[in-house]
């Protein structure tokens, strides 16, 4: 089954509240739709007469080797998709040879994620009660997390008036399973909320707390990227939160080139939001990303077919990437650079494409 077929199957199997939550976008959904469209709009300049008999999609992310540059994004409420949640996702990552992000709102214990055998990074929402964040980070470190993903683009949930779907309530959903009921009760709903006062200083604080590299997720501006670097970030995820942050925001495909030029090689760059094909992944790598994070397609696959479904989608996209590499004349993902892209000095009059010839 393809990713699209897994999604269709998942929508048949899941209750409405789950499909509404998983598919929710901000506002009218324009950012989500444009994210995919902008990856599709990237144009390539293929090499010819290159030896592509042996292809290599392997790379490293913050020193961790992976067999594919397609990583698993941190996603909440995975128990609503599958009764093993992130534990099943972790097994898929291990079987594929990739890495996964694990949400602050993970539905299973960190120990169950670690048992899956894949390298993993812990995604952090900094809470108003800072002690809760400290506890979560310490427990993630104790269970083998190799890095922290600091999500900075979701300061508050969008009000239901903006998009009722974004507030879909998943019955029985897990909230911060890696905190005890007593810890959650002591903090209250106010303490578990995202802290809107955090600034760039939080990057250094998290690094000092954990001794782990900190990857900042949700950057769409070059000046913000530079400030993250100055604050000690080891990586940046150029992301629009899958279109769930702000309806008319800039897309990662548009933001990535500027950010890549600004930070140069000072940090590793990653991208997410709207990536659906091997061509999209190749475009992101050529625009400056070292790897990409994939979200919803894997969540739908998890719901439709468990860990095997997730692995099937990851394998499918990696095979698609290999095909694109073959057609571009590059044998290794490290060769996917701006050299294979259309440049501003080679404009294409898109409106003229596919127009019928004029006669008379």
Label each PLM-derived region with a short phrase.
Residues 1-66, 160, 168-199, 334-336, ...:
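An N-cap/entry alpha-helix motif that binds or orients negatively charged groups
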Residues 35, 251-262, 302-322:
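C-terminal helical cap(s) of enzyme catalytic domains, especially alpha/beta-barrels
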Residues 60-105:
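Active-site cofactor/substrate anionic-group-binding motifs, chiefly glycine-
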Residues 71-77, 119-125, 188-189:
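Short, basic, glycine/proline-bearing loop/turn elements
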Residues 77, 90-91, 128-271, 278-300:
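Alpha/beta enzyme core
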Residues 94-133:
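A gly/proline- and charged-residue-enriched helix-loop-helix capping module
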Residues 325:
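An acidic-aromatic loop/edge-strand motif
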Residues 329:
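Active-site-adjacent helical/loop segments in soluble small-molecule enzymes
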């Amino acid at each position: 089954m393809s990713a699209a077929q897994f999604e269709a199957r998942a929508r048949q199997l899941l209750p409405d509240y789950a499909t509404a939550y998983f598919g929710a976008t901000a506002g009218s959904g324009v950012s989500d739709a444009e994210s995919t469209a902008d990856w599709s709009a990237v144009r390539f300049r293929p090499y010819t007469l290159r030896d592509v008999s042996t292809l290599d999609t392997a790379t490293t992310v913050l020193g961790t080797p992976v067999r594919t540059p397609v990583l698993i994004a941190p996603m909440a409420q995975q128990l609503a998709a599958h009764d093993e949640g992130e534990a099943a996702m972790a097994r898929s990552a291990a079987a594929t040879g990739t890495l996964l992000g694990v949400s602050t709102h993970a539905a299973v214990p960190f120990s169950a994620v670690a048992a899956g055998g894949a390298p993993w990074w812990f995604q952090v929402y900094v809470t108003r009660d800072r002690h809760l964040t400290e506890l979560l980070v310490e427990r993630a470190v104790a269970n083998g997390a190799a890095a922290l993903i600091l999500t900075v683009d979701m300061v508050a949930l969008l009000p239901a008036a903006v998009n009722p779907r974004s507030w879909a309530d998943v019955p029985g959903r897990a909230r911060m399973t890696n905190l005890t009921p007593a810890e959650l009760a002591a903090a209250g709903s106010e303490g578990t909320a995202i802290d809107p006062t955090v600034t760039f200083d939080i990057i250094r604080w998290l690094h000092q707390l954990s001794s782990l590299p900190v990857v900042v997720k949700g950057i769409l501006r070059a000046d913000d990227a530079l400030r993250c670097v100055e604050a000690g970030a080891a990586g940046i995820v150029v992301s629009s939160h899958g279109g769930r942050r702000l309806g008319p925001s800039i897309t990662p495909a548009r933001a990535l080139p500027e950010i890549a030029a600004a930070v140069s090689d000072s940090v590793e760059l990653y991208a997410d939001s709207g990536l659906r094909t091997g061509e999209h992944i190749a475009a992101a790598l050529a625009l400056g990303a070292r790897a990409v994070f994939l979200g919803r397609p894997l969540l739908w696959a998890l719901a439709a077919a468990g860990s095997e479904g997730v692995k099937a989608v990851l394998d499918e996209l990696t095979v698609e990437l290999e095909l694109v590499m073959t057609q571009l004349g590059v044998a290794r993902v490290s060769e996917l650079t701006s050299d294979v892209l259309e440049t501003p000095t080679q404009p294409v009059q898109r409106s003229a494409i596919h127009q019928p010839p004029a006669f008379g």
